[in-house]
Regions:
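Alpha-helical solenoid repeat scaffolds of the TPR/TPR-like class and their adjacent stem/linker regions
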Residues: 1-426, 437, 479-482
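Glycosyltransferase donor-sugar binding loop
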Residues: 295-300, 460-475
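Charged, low-complexity intrinsically disordered terminal segments
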Residues: 425-427, 436-440, 444, 464
Length: 486
């Protein structure tokens, strides 16, 4: 096959490429090069058409499975999930052990909402690679990670824990596997959280913990700061900043210009963080600040909190589909003065965006109470409860203090106070309460609860329900300590 040289303008180039593909004169490398170029220019439809045409006339080519793979990925990006599934199946018909296609076929099933089919797809691949090469082992572990992730999201915690442990036994250096495994153990109150085997050491397990998980595991502030630093270094790494000149702080006071403040979060919706922030966004003094919201979460429909937030800010940006670099470019082009990270190290965080330093001032606020341990978060907004003055040495950020760090929406509907009977509580008992998630309950805390309840006859502990099996596990431990589970 021939390579493509200069073949004219952009529109004529596309038509010439189609003709070359039809006559089997378009080299495989050129298919990828031009399709990727079209995609980067926002011409994804033309990229899809180029792949489709080439495949129609070159299906016998020894590299056809790779073109089917790229074609499928592009269709998935355009939300043509059935087409993506068919293309990925075609790739696997040519090469049944094509690891990336095995993984992405499961992802396409997941996108279609067929979670059992996604899990079965990955399981079949895992079973077919029990005797395999080092390269295929990597894809086998990846498939196991996806199974664990989907099961975790579906609340199948014990099943997810089992498959992730098997993945760790195969590749203990894959920290993302251990990160999910330890978090799942916490949600089930399985103590001790950390275990080891002949293949996985205790040190590897601890090193795989995310800062969020570690915050529920250890109260050692130096340990938490060190883990945040290491996590940031490995997760964000050394980004290419050559096209991101360092932003300088602009003096705007007295110039008539408004300060541009940007909030980046996946939780600007019906979510605990969204509930906290919505009135705060409404209360900004719009004569002195211009508010930009950068939403990096999944699309939501008919979301009352997001609707209210969109009305409160000056500019709303959906950046969920953008790469970290593209999102950082968007923020930089908006000339944001102060960029606020509302996620920290919580779920769906886009920490790499901040690594590009798209604003001169970057602040950690509201979503994550720990230190980011990063070189690009300069400040953290906190109060005396979140960061006592004596604890500031354990934060890489300069701590800026306000009276209360927890925004409250005063317009939020408050239900009528229920009676004890309606809440399922005894009329005359003293009620201790804990409405934290299960992952925040430690073995030490549980021992203290047992001591308190035993020393306080007639009292009860009112808890937030978690996973059904975790509830049963805690109740069984209370009963074993002589405390009535009812």
């Amino acid at each position: 096959m021939n390579s493509v040289a200069n073949v004219g303008s952009s529109s004529s180039l596309f038509l010439n490429l189609l003709e070359l593909a039809k006559s089997q004169r378009l080299a495989l490398g050129d298919v990828f090069k031009f399709a990727e170029s079209f995609s980067a220019e926002g011409r994804k439809g033309e990229a899809v058409e180029l792949y489709k045409t080439w495949l129609a006339f070159n299906e016998a080519h020894p590299g056809a499975q790779m073109v089917y793979f790229n074609y499928s990925v592009m269709l998935r990006q355009l939300n043509d999930i059935p087409g993506s599934i068919n293309a990925m199946r075609a790739a696997l018909k040519i090469d049944p052990m094509f690891g990336p296609a095995q993984i992405n076929l499961g992802r396409a099933f997941e996108d279609s909402g067929s979670f059992p089919q996604a899990i079965q797809q990955w399981r079949s691949f895992v079973e077919s690679t029990s005797e395999t090469t080092p390269d295929r082992l990597s894809y086998r572990v990846m498939a196991m990670q996806h199974i664990g992730r989907v099961m975790e999201n579906a609340g199948l915690l014990e099943e997810a824990e089992t498959i992730l442990w098997d993945a760790m036994e195969l590749r203990p250096e894959k920290t993302e596997t251990g990160q999910h495994w330890s978090a799942i153990r916490q949600r089930q109150c399985k103590w001790p959280i950390i275990t080891s085997s002949s293949h996985v050491t205790q040190r590897q397990m601890i090193d795989s913990m995310s800062p969020l998980t570690l915050g529920c595991y250890s109260d050692d502030p130096m340990f938490q700061l060190a883990r945040a630093y290491e996590y940031n270094k490995s997760f964000v790494g050394r980004l290419d900043l050559r096209n991101f000149p360092r932003k300088t702080v602009k003096q705007k006071t007295g110039t008539g210009q408004r300060l541009r403040v940007g909030y980046v979060s996946s939780d600007l919706r019906d979510h605990a963080v969204g509930f906290a922030l919505r009135e705060m966004l409404e209360l900004h003094d719009k004569t002195s600040v211009e508010i930009h919201a950068y939403y990096c979460g999944d699309p939501v429909a008919n979301d009352a909190t997001q609707t209210r937030m969109k009305a409160a800010v000056d500019v709303w940006h959906d950046i969920g589909t953008l790469t970290d670099e593209a999102a950082a470019r968007q923020i930089a082009s908006d000339e944001i003065d102060i960029l606020i990270d509302v996620n920290g190290y919580t779920k769906h965080a886009r920490t790499k965006i901040f690594g590009y330093r798209p604003a001169p001032v970057i602040v950690n606020f509201c979503g994550y109470p720990g230190s980011m341990g990063s070189p690009f978060h300069q400040y953290m907004i906190a109060d005396a409860q979140i960061v006592p003055p004596s604890s500031e040495i354990y934060y890489s950020e300069k701590v800026l203090r306000i009276a209360c760090n927890q925004p409250i929406d005063r317009k939020r509907f408050i239900a009528e106070k229920p009676s004890r009977e309606k809440a399922g509580l005894p009329e005359n008992a003293f009620v201790f309460a804990c409405f934290n998630g299960m992952q925040k309950i430690t073995a030490g805390t549980f021992e203290q609860w047992k001591t308190i309840l035993t020393a306080t006859p007639g009292s009860i502990l009112w808890m937030l329900s978690g996973n059904e099996k975790a509830d049963q596990r805690l109740l069984a431990m209370f009963v074993a300590a002589g405390i009535d589970a009812e």
